[in-house]
Structure formats: structure tokens, C-alpha cells
Amino acid sequence: MKKGLFISIFMLAVTYVGVLLTGNGAIAAEPIVIGIASSLGLGTGQQSMDAIKMVVEEINSRGGITVGSSKRPLKVETVDLRDAEPGVPVTEALLGMEKLIIGKKAYAILVGPYRSEALLASMDLIAKHKVLMLLSIAMTPEMENKIQKDYESYKYVFRLCINSKNFMEYMAGLYTYIGSEFKFKRVYVLNEDSGFSRAAVNPLIANYFEKPDSGWTVMGHRTFPIGATDYTTGLMDAQMKGAQALLMLTSMPQGINLVKQWKSMKISALMAGYTGLLTTEEAWKELGGGFGGAMDLIMEMGNGIGVKEIPRSLEFLDKYVKRYGPWPKGGAMPHGIAPAYESMYILQEAIEKAGTLDPDAVVKEIEKTDRMGAMGRIRFDKNHQVVYGVDPQKASVAVVIQWRDDGQRVIVFPESIAKGKIELPAGLKTGR
């Protein structure tokens, strides 16, 4: 009886050890769980998730991440926070993140909340659990302020995409270039009545256009309700007042009507700003053309566009298209996807340099990041925001494209990577 019991226990032990062994006899390493949390039902969230999964597949094909003397595979767990959907409370998004951290034991959260309100609230959750979070969508500069005020609590949070301050700097830089290049002085502002547009346009007017040294005079400012389809009154007013440039800021699908009406009415003023709809290579075909001359901002290089000056932007696009098919997917905005892609590489490098999964040690290595990536040079400032500028050898970059009447898009800003000059609409002369 005792002999039989001993044999049974021995066989159970052998079976247990066998479960832990891989095919080559090595102990199977426990995977590192990478959590992807955002509004994954939207195109931007979905594409960001796809980009990260592509990197995870690549890393796992090489055996995983090297942690000290061992290799650890990666496992992706996802949660759709739905925080970009109307009526979804921030508390629901936080609950989803907490389930990922506690239930799925996520080591790090990538992409992160879509809305700035959800991001700021989630930082306390990240601090509580000491989980790394590398952001690539939400843009509020208040993230950096929180890190500056309480570094020890919030040091686990980093952002790779541009923030709203960077956004305004690019708009100001573009208009400074336009003013210098064409000797223009008169601008008219057209924006939708959304939180995004108000948060961007009001500081831009107050802190740039209305400053004497900007060289610009604001001839008028029209705010249209969300969902508006007729923008003719604002366009006619801009024409009547002699505006030489139209700053447009929209993020809703109806914004395409503003650009098309500008074109069909033959308004003799440059159309330059942000819609998010006119940036992809497929936009001309999908939207029926009719917006040649319009300029739009792509918030980070690599989001559907690449240049030889930034080799990894072309490499990323090539890999993405081979893996998932033509860009874009699901109407994604030109924002966040390339930063999400780079976030997984940055996390991998930091873990391998630290030689441990201790979050404090990995934070120190992320802070030292200095790599050439899909957006240009990637470095973090002291408050964990990636540095953006106009020279990809020194910083990550956003780009402004202008559509030509033959349906081709051309990078016109910043000058360091421009592929053509800004073309003026018919009837608009320089320096008038």
C-alpha cells in the first residue's frame, strides 16, 4: 500500500515537471503580459493595437525579451475602454484598466486612454499598482504637470505622441512659415464647436495670432455646431474681409464639407489646419477628391506616411501593410499609431538594459531612451513627454501635407523633410 502511494506521488511529480518543460527540456518561462487599453472600437485604437501586436509577434519569434539571463515571451491582453464613446463615464474606463492590471496581471499598459480626462484619472491607478504606462493617443499637457509635481507617484507614465501644446506649436510654426514665405498677414479662423477644437483654437489665437510679433491679424472667427454641413457663410465672410489664409480645425466627418465648399466656391485663401480626414493616401479616392490645395496636419510621422530621411517610418509602413493590408483601417485619424508601434520597442529595450522587470529600474532606462524611430529621433523630456520639433535628427516630427489637384499629397512642412513648396489657390497673390 505504501509502495503504491509512493509510486503515485512520484508519477504526479514527474507529470508536473513535464508540464513546466518546453520541447527542448528547458523550463518554460512565464510570459510577460502586455496590456493594450484604449477605445479599441475606433480606427485609431484598433490600428494602434495591431501595430503593437506586430512588434510582439516579431519579438516572440526571436524567443521573447531577454530579462537578465533568461528569455521571456510576451502575451498580449486587451480591453476596450470605450472612453471615446459619448456617455461612457471615466469610472467605467478605470474599471476596465484595473481588470487588466489585477485580473490579467498586466506588467505594462500601452496606448492608454483616448480621452484626456480618463488619462489623468488613470494615473492614480498606475501609481497605486506601479505598472508602466506608455501612452500614444491622449494629448493633455496636464500629464506632465502631474509628473513634475509628484514624480515618485507618477514616474511610471510616459507619452510618445504629441501633446496639445506640441499641436499648437506646429500650427504656429506652419503659419509663421506661410507668413514669411508669402508675406501674408490676414487669417480667418473656422472651427467646429467641440472640446478638441476649442481647446486648440482659443489658446492658438490668444498666444500666437494676437501677439504683435506673429505678423498676423485675425479677420474673423466662426464656430460651427458639431454636425454642421453648410459652411458657406463663414467662407463668404472670410473672402469679403480679405483673408489670405483660413485656419480650419475640425475632427468630425462633416468637416470635409468645409474643405470641399472652400474649393467649389473658389475662395482665394490658403486652407491650412487640421481635419484628420485628408491625410491618408486613400482619402482622395474615398472622399471623391475636390480638395486640391488643402493642407492638413499628420500628428506624427509614420502614421500613413514615410520619408527616406526617417528610414524607420518607411520600414514601419511596409511591415504594417504586409501584415494587415492597405492603410488606413476603420477611418483612423493620423495620430498615435506610429508612437504605439515604437512604445513596444522602447519597453523591450528598457527591460533588457535594466536586466530586470523591477518597474523602478525599467523607468530609469526608459528615461534614457535615445533611438531613431518611425517618428524621427525619440527622446523623453524630464516630464516623460517625447520631444517634438522640426528636425528628425534632433526630435520626433509631425508633418503638414498639401493635396495637389491630381490627387497626390506632398509634404510641405517642416522644411527639413518637405518634398515640395506650398502652392497658392487661383487668384491669391503674395504680399497683398
Question: Where in the sequence are the language-model features?
Answer:
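Hydrophobic alpha-helical
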Residues: R115-K128, L204, T229-M236, K241-M265, ...
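Extracytoplasmic ligand/sensor domains, especially the bilobed periplasmic-binding protein
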Residues: A106-G220, L270-L297
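Short, low-complexity disordered leader/linker segments with a strong preference
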Residues: M1-V33, I101, K128, K429-R432
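Beta-alpha junction/loop-to-helix N-cap segments that form part of ligand/metal-binding clefts
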Residues: A29-P31, T44-D50, I65-Q148, L160, ...
